[in-house]
Amino acid sequence: MIVNLIERIYGFLWGDLLQIPLPGGGSVGISLLIILLIPAGIYFTIRTRGLPIRLFPDMVVALTGKKDDNNSLSTFQTLIVSTATRVGMGNLVGVVAAVSAGGAGAVFWMWVTALIGSSTAFIEATLAQMHKERDPLYGGFRGGPAYYIHDYIEGRTGKKKNHVLVSVLFAVSGLICWCGISQVISNSVAASFENAFSIPPLYTTIVLVILAAVIVLRKNATVKVLDLMVPFMAVCYFFITIFIIVTNIGSLPGVFVRIIQEAFGARQVVAGGFGAVLMNGVKRGLFSNEAGSGSAPCAAAAAECDKPVKAGFTQALGVFIDTIVICSCTAMIMLLVPEKLLAGKEGMDLLQTAMKYHLGEFGVIFIAVTLFLFSFSTFLGILFYARSNVAYLFGDNWASQTAYKVLALVMLFIGGIAAYTFVWDLGDVGIGLMTIFNTVILYLMGGQALRELKKYEAARKEQKKKN
């Protein structure tokens, strides 16, 4: 019953809302979320005058911001938290799923989603910083879409409200999404460890839940652990990929040719496969970099910075790191393997086969450990996101905060034995609903963030004149 309901909602969000006929009898299926996300990304890229490229140096400089309150987070720490969730399941299992279903061309559309999505990420993170509030439970600040949606509707109606329906729907969708992701985490880690070490999934899941509980049930341990874990795991994965690319440098041009050909190739269009290529690239790009979904603003709001746009710059950079760098690493690992060796494989089995081809048994062990670290950091990150949404729904009390953490731990356990397709669908449903509520409000509130960007650039220009 529940599985059927999830599948029906998934079909509405991610299924083909429009069918565009193509030469040769095929068609391109366009989902509701693509209709929302792609125009939003293009619109904000135009309105910010190509911010991801034009202001890339400012994104890097924004990471050097200092903080005065020990309970608040620096811009760099909020990047770490958001990167923990971005550089996680989507970068490994998500890329595998995209390429398996949509071919190499899906990688190109993941890149496009990231480039235009960076502008969307800037807008939503800047809004979160502008509408943040003090957090009486954890200290520092909190916020996110539930909060800026609330402020917008209060401002429009002129009435003070305890809760706003759209904010409530967003917060509930977020909690559903993060429960779904919790299941994906244990499901994928358990399968990976079974393939690499022949450890029964139940044992792996139990250990994962215990380790997570030790950290998340403590007040402020999450950020401290992520500060150490995320840079280490990302750098290790990046350099292993560089080694693989260097040792297969002769095949690299062919990989890029294949990506471009399958992204636009006549074979895909005539066969009607272009829709699958586009859909899987965009869908997994969103699941990985979260631009427009409203997740990362929950971290952006926690930053202590002198200008709201700096929080926006930080999250725009996070999208670049996630998709252009880390997701590309996974894609290269897969696409540098002869296609016949990967035939008939899916999920982590496919990725581990690719790593075994490149690095032997060490590759299988490395990707299993990497998946564990990526997944563990993702779980910690999504529970950080959940804080502000739980507080919005249930108020400032430790009972509700602890209850959701326990629920997420239960979902983490259940995911180890759940069906692979169902747990992905649950996560996709949650992130899809979040994206609908958030993207619509971004069109309405985006002008606020754009005005902050204009003020920032005017001040920078004035400062240059003085110097």
Show which residues each predicted segment covers.
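N-terminal alpha-helical transmembrane segments of multi-pass membrane transport
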Residues: 1-89, 99-106, 117, 443-467
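Membrane-interface loop-to-helix entry segments
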Residues: 36, 47, 51-60, 166, ...
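Helix-loop-helix module between adjacent transmembrane segments
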Residues: 40-45, 116-141, 150-187, 191-215, ...
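Transmembrane helix-loop junctions in multi-pass membrane proteins
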Residues: 47-52, 91-95, 178-190, 213-225, ...
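Flexible loop linkers connecting adjacent transmembrane helices
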Residues: 50-75, 97, 103-104, 119-161, ...
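Alpha-helical membrane segments and immediately flanking helix-loop junctions
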Residues: 69-101, 127-130, 137-153, 169-172, ...
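Selective recognition of specific alpha-helical transmembrane segments in multi-pass small-molecule
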Residues: 116-124, 204-219, 230-250, 283-286, ...
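Extracellular/periplasmic helix-exit of transmembrane alpha-helices
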Residues: 124-136, 242-258, 272, 302-305, ...
